[in-house]
Amino acid sequence: MKKILGIESSCDDTAISIITERRKILSNIIISQNTEHAVFGGVVPEIAARSHLSNLDQALKNVLKKSNTELTEISAIAATSGPGLIGGVIVGSMFARSLSSALKKPFIAINHLEGHALTARLTDNISYPYLLLLASGGHCQFVAVLGLGKYKILGTTIDDAVGETFDKVAKMLNLSFPGGPEIEKRAKLGNPHKYKFPKPIINSGNCNMSFSGLKTAVRTLIMNLKEVNDSVINDIAASFQFTIGAILSSKMQDAIRLYKQILNDYYEDINHPTKLNLKSFRKDEFNWKPLECITRPKYRIHIQNSYRSNLLNDTIVIAGGVAANKYLQEILSDCTRPYGYRLIAPPMHLCTDNAAMIAYAGLERYNNKLFSPLDFCPKAKWSLEDI
């Protein structure tokens, strides 16, 4: 049985996992660095990289022992090779490539975002294509997931990522790190309508998002309040989370319309293997304008007749650390249901950074013989569209 070993080190969690060709997670080890970074109220890249260097050997021993696996049984080694904090990415990638060289097994460089994008295929075995909202500490984007390595970004944040905004607001409120879970916990105790915060570019008519203005509004409110007690913190957390939900819900509706346009307007419904033709949009424009676009061959995918019914897949996936927020899951589920879509979020432990998603992305690439050279250069920035 094929076994893929995955390594994740793009931020502050050192993670190694082993999965089988049948998508069974044999072991999924995560060594957290929260204690090291909590005193700073955020992740310190240098500390993160040094901790990865110290933790990887032990994480490998733990994952092999827990999965009852010998290193010689590993079929391939997959590792996050970007995007992320470059120090940690280099450490994890070098560790993986060393294993690959020593074991004479294939090395597979994985885009961290692709790991998140494919997690629902690991947990729920969904088919391509589907619409994805990737919401994490470093990214927030709507993506049409058309196939392995075939991604179309429909919209993205033009400033701060949503997860980063959660963490920074939590820090303003003197809540512990990481801030996302703390905001969610406090929000349950507060009044979501106590404070009205701005919803930047919510009516722009496209899928792009902005969170910096919201963050500034929260900071201004806190500075102007005479007292910030527990009750006030709860109300701010609830109002902030409510506003995030409203922004994402509005943008989700824009994303659904654009996603349908991509799948319907450019699909040739004929009686033999067909092509889905996607049009690129100009990078310097927020609005997608098909008539001004040129065809990009990398966004053509061939679909067999047996998959025709899946072309209008009724699934929307939310992934990334922010996807673990139950309130946002409920809000987005209510938003997508009238459009005939079901919302899927991976289990909480697979929403946040983990190596099982990296191993699974590696498995899909292994099955398609998409291997990477040992001199693959890790990347701090790496768009899904550039895989």
Curated annotation (Swiss-Prot):
Enzyme Commission number(s) of this protein: 2.3.1.234
A single MF term (Gene Ontology): N(6)-L-threonylcarbamoyladenine synthase activity
Binding locations of substrate: L134, A135, S136, G137, G138, D167, G180, N325
InterPro entries: ATPase_NBD, Gcp-like_dom, KAE1/TsaD, Peptidase_M22_CS, RPE3, TsaD
Keyword Acyltransferase attributed: yes
Cited Pfam families: TsaD
Protein keywords: Acyltransferase, Cytoplasm, Iron, Metal-binding, Transferase, tRNA processing
Residues that coordinate or bind Fe cation: H112, H116, D353
Principal location class: cytoplasm
Cofactor: Fe(2+)
UniProt GO BP: tRNA threonylcarbamoyladenosine modification
GO CC, one annotated term: cytoplasm
Cellular localisation: Cytoplasm
Cofactor comment text: Binds 1 Fe(2+) ion per subunit.
Catalytic reactions on record: L-threonylcarbamoyladenylate + adenosine(37) in tRNA = N(6)-L-threonylcarbamoyladenosine(37) in tRNA + AMP + H(+)
Recorded family membership: Belongs to the KAE1 / TsaD family.
Known function: Required for the formation of a threonylcarbamoyl group on adenosine at position 37 (t(6)A37) in tRNAs that read codons beginning with adenine. Is involved in the transfer of the threonylcarbamoyl moiety of threonylcarbamoyl-AMP (TC-AMP) to the N6 group of A37, together with TsaE and TsaB. TsaD likely plays a direct catalytic role in this reaction.
Protein name, per record: tRNA N6-adenosine threonylcarbamoyltransferase
Organism: Rickettsia prowazekii (strain Madrid E)
Organism ancestry: Bacteria, Pseudomonadati, Pseudomonadota, Alphaproteobacteria, Rickettsiales
